[in-house]
A protein has these predicted regions:
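Loop/turn elements at helix/coil->beta-strand transitions in domains of secreted/extracellular proteins
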Residues: 45-49, 76-81, 136-141, 185-192, ...
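Substrate-gating cap/lid alpha-helix
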Residues: 196-241, 278
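A solvent-exposed, charged loop/short amphipathic helix patch at secondary-structure junctions
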Residues: 152-171, 255-267
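Histidine-centered active-site loop/cap adjacent to the catalytic His
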Residues: 252-302
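Conserved SGNH/GDSL esterase-like catalytic core that processes O-acyl groups on lipids
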Residues: 58-60, 64-166
């Protein structure tokens, strides 16, 4: 039986039982990614160079004994480097808010920054790295803003702005739309957006949820290439039953069980994801990254930038 039909029948049965016995049930919303064939969650056959643009949340995520992302990526055949505060030309490593991405990959990009990013092979955080550098440039670029970027003003369904960068839903959509112009010229690279983690405060939580759902479900609908992907780090941290993962042969984006605020904050007043949340994200992300990588490679990417 078709998996989607089976899931729907199961949900109807559970809902019916709830009605009969007077129970109030919350059923998950499960988005299933469109698939062009088999999905391959296996590690690359040969080491692949990867760089991660981040700040403190990413540093914790990479760290051994916390999120273990760096070590896990290495075990999956990725040679991992990273940027952090103070990194790079003009100290651009300090600037990783959504409004800053145009300086990296948008209309304000700088060739010196990009050359440094693609060539970087150092570790700017602490994590185990046992692989030898396979040479060449970084092929995969992960980039993430931190949790203050979940405080987006405006309304959940606001359309993209036409100009200007600020901390609103409209502006955030504009920024990511503008990035696609550059990404289309760099089909020789795989760019992976890591969504900003959630806040504990719920004031703008509905906006954060709507924006990240837009990134996962709508942003790339009309983008014709396979060199851009999204991992919903935000969603994985909003409830133990929320997932963005490879499950039962499908990529699932499971929402709607819990709320839109952080369930894995380090402490009251500190929204850095804790070790449990960071490890959950690692477990869900790495198989997806493998899928993104194989899908990109199967598309026959060019070896040089596209003019």
């Amino acid at each position: 039986m078709n998996k989607k039909l089976l899931r729907s029948l199961r949900a109807v049965f559970v809902l019916g039982v709830g009605v009969i016995f007077g129970l109030t049930l919350v059923l998950p919303t499960i988005g299933v990614a469109a698939q062009d064939g088999g999905l391959d969650p296996s590690s690359p056959d040969e080491p692949v160079r990867l760089i991660f643009i981040h700040h403190s949340t990413g540093e914790n995520w990479l760290r051994d004994g916390y999120g273990n992302l760096g070590r896990t990526l290495g075990e999956s055949n990725y040679f991992v480097s990273d940027t952090n505060y103070g990194w790079g030309p003009y100290g651009i490593g300090d600037s990783t808010d959504i409004v800053n991405w145009p300086q990296w990959f948008g209309p304000e990009r700088d060739d010196q920054v990009l050359a440094a990013l693609f060539g970087e092979s150092a570790q700017n955080s602490e994590y185990t790295r046992n692989l030898s550098n396979p040479g060449g440039e970084n092929e995969i670029i992960l980039f993430k803003s931190c949790f203050p970027n979940s405080e987006l003003r405006g309304n959940p369904n606001d359309p993209p702005a036409s100009s200007g960068y600020d901390y609103t839903v409209r502006s955030a959509k504009l920024v990511y739309n503008e990035l696609l112009d550059y990404f289309a010229t760099r089909q020789d690279k795989l760019f992976v957006v890591i969504t900003a983690p959630p806040l504990s405060d719920g004031t703008y939580a509905n906006n954060a949820r709507a924006f990240n759902n837009w990134l996962v479900n709508e942003w790339l609908q009309d983008y014709p290439y396979q060199n851009v992907a999204v991992f919903d780090f935000y969603n994985t941290l909003t409830d133990p039953q929320h997932h963005h993962w490879f499950n039962n042969g499908e990529i699932e984006h499971v929402t709607g069980v819990g709320g839109n605020t952080s369930k894995y904050a380090s402490s009251q007043g500190d929204d850095h994801p804790n070790a449990a949340g960071s490890q959950k994200a690692t477990d869900e992300f790495v198989p997806l990254l493998n899928i993104f990588y194989h899908r990109w490679q199967a598309s026959g990417p060019p070896s040089e930038p596209v003019s």
